[in-house]
Amino acid sequence: AAQNIIKNYANHRALDDVSIDIPEGAIYGLLGPNGAGKTSLIRIITQITGPDSGKLFFKGVPLIPSDMNRIGYLPEERGLYKKMKVGEQAVYLARLKGINKNDAIKRLKTWFEKFEIEAWWDKKVEELSKGMAQKVQFITTVLHEPEMLIFDEPFSGFDPINVELLKKEILDLGYEISQVEDGK
């Protein structure tokens, strides 16, 4: 939840008393024109920047830096290390989220098959198309099974077929997360 968030940049107020409460298991979208403050709010929630005033909560308690390990974030500005091999980089990113190497490889292989990119495991990132790289980044965002997912412009650069694939996976993840939280 975000309560009464205000954020100013120089002479521009990007967020003016914004409050939002998203129930567990829910899927929300932030809609608005360019410059409306969507990315600013996301950057505040993910603690990339701070609000000028207001409060943030995660599961009913004040949000703290260690909560970021329980959140998956796919930023609008995508970036992978171009010279690394795809699989090597995906394992590295999984390890940063606390997944051991063998478990990371197993989970990644499952996701790579689901997204039909298993043939790219040993290729360098620079050989990937923009859409393929975005699939890898989506996978590394959700791999550690975060309790909350935040996507900024998740469908940007995808063709219609892959937009549908990504939508399906986001909905499936939302359903799975709500089932776990309900204790089912």
Short names for language-model regions:
Residues 46:
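Helix-to-loop junction immediately C-terminal to a conserved catalytic motif
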Residues 54-69:
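Conserved ABC transporter NBD signature motif
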Residues 91, 95, 103-120, 171:
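Conserved ABC ATPase "signature" region
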Residues 124-131:
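Conserved ABC ATPase signature
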Residues 163-178:
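Helical segment within the ABC ATPase nucleotide-binding domain
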